[in-house]
Amino acid sequence: MSWLEKIIPSISRTETKRSNKVPEGLWEKCVKCDAVLYKPELEKNLDVCPKCDHHMRIGARSRLNIFLDPQNRQELATDVEPVDRLKFKDIKKYKDRLSSAQKDTGEKDALIAMRGELKGMPVVAVAFEFAFHGGSMGYVVGERFTRAATVALNENIPLVCFSATGGARMQEALISLMQMAKTSAVIERLKMQGTPYVSVMTDPVYGGVSASLALLGDINVAEPGARAGFAGPSIIEQTIRQKLPKGFQRAEFLLEHGAIDMIIHRGEMRDKLASLLAKFTRRAAV
């Protein structure tokens, strides 16, 4: 074997090895159009597919970072943490599910609340973390929402909620159902005072959250293509034994049938909500 033949195979093996080393998380596939997207570019586009305009799910903290001005932020109710009061267990202990979700997301529970500014206007904003137990509402979510709404009430500044949830948290039973009444009550206090509450539904919004805080806004908004309803389409079809209309429970269907007030593209959310809230509060947006 010549010296050249000895070198060529090693070069070939090295090149093959290098070409297979693609960093994890660098690419993401759009679930709607199957386009393979470069993650850094996708993030610059606010996680909206540039090919088909599909709005992908984003984390609660990312959502608030996109929405609020970068300065003068204060996270609220960080002392409220989940407790397994019922010692619930199905195929897995609830406390183990909580630990796993906290490890995966880096969050204590499924809702983050912040006081901040939107184009210079003071606001309180809350966002659901769907990656944490499906964004389900238990004691912590209900309590954080209520405390955030109370801050908005006391300071008479708008409250904006970004929902992404499967509904009430099964593992907390009646405690989770109680949050529906608690959050609805504090929203009623906002309405009585005339403090604006804007509900923004992102994909998906179901169950006890849709039956309480998500559809009680002075303005109910949805992102394009977002699904919202009490029960999912498959459950409804099985119950009524009929085929549902195309696009049932999607934002466009809900707007057409008067269930929501408007659909706002993620890239326009800051500008349009700032304009709305400026009219509500008679404050000028910067």
Curated annotation (Swiss-Prot):
Cofactor(s), names only, from the UniProt record:
Zn(2+)
Q: Give the EC number.
A: 2.1.3.15
Q: Where are the zinc fingers (C4-type)?
A: 30-52
Keyword Transcription regulation belongs to the record:
no
Which InterPro entries does the UniProt entry name for this protein? AcCoA_carboxyl_beta, Acetyl_CoA_COase_Trfase_b_su, ClpP/crotonase-like_dom_sf, COA_CT_N, Znf-ACC
A GO BP annotation: malonyl-CoA biosynthetic process
Entry keyword Transferase: yes
Q: Which SUPFAM superfamilies match?
A: ClpP/crotonase
- Spell out the reaction equation it catalyses: N(6)-carboxybiotinyl-L-lysyl-[protein] + acetyl-CoA = N(6)-biotinyl-L-lysyl-[protein] + malonyl-CoA
Q: Which residues form the CoA carboxyltransferase N-terminal domain?
A: 26-286
- UniProt binding sites for Zn(2+): C30, C33, C49, C52
* Chief place where the protein resides: cytoplasm
Molecular function via GO? acetyl-CoA carboxylase activity; ATP binding; carboxyl- or carbamoyltransferase activity; zinc ion binding
Q: In which pathway does it act?
A: Lipid metabolism; malonyl-CoA biosynthesis; malonyl-CoA from acetyl-CoA: step 1/1
**Sorted UniProt keywords:** ATP-binding, Cytoplasm, Fatty acid biosynthesis, Fatty acid metabolism, Lipid biosynthesis, Lipid metabolism, Metal-binding, Nucleotide-binding, Transferase, Zinc, Zinc-finger
The record's cofactor note says: Binds 1 zinc ion per subunit.
Give, as one word, the top-level EC class: transferase
Q: Where in the cell is it found?
A: Cytoplasm
GO CC terms: acetate CoA-transferase complex
* Functional note: Component of the acetyl coenzyme A carboxylase (ACC) complex. Biotin carboxylase (BC) catalyzes the carboxylation of biotin on its carrier protein (BCCP) and then the CO(2) group is transferred by the transcarboxylase to acetyl-CoA to form malonyl-CoA.
UniProt lists the family membership as follows: Belongs to the AccD/PCCB family.
Give the matching HAMAP family: AcetylCoA_CT_beta (MF_01395)
Subunit description: Acetyl-CoA carboxylase is a heterohexamer composed of biotin carboxyl carrier protein (AccB), biotin carboxylase (AccC) and two subunits each of ACCase subunit alpha (AccA) and ACCase subunit beta (AccD).
PANTHER family membership: ACETYL-COENZYME A CARBOXYLASE CARBOXYL TRANSFERASE SUBUNIT BETA, CHLOROPLASTIC (PTHR42995:SF5)
Name it: Acetyl-coenzyme A carboxylase carboxyl transferase subunit beta
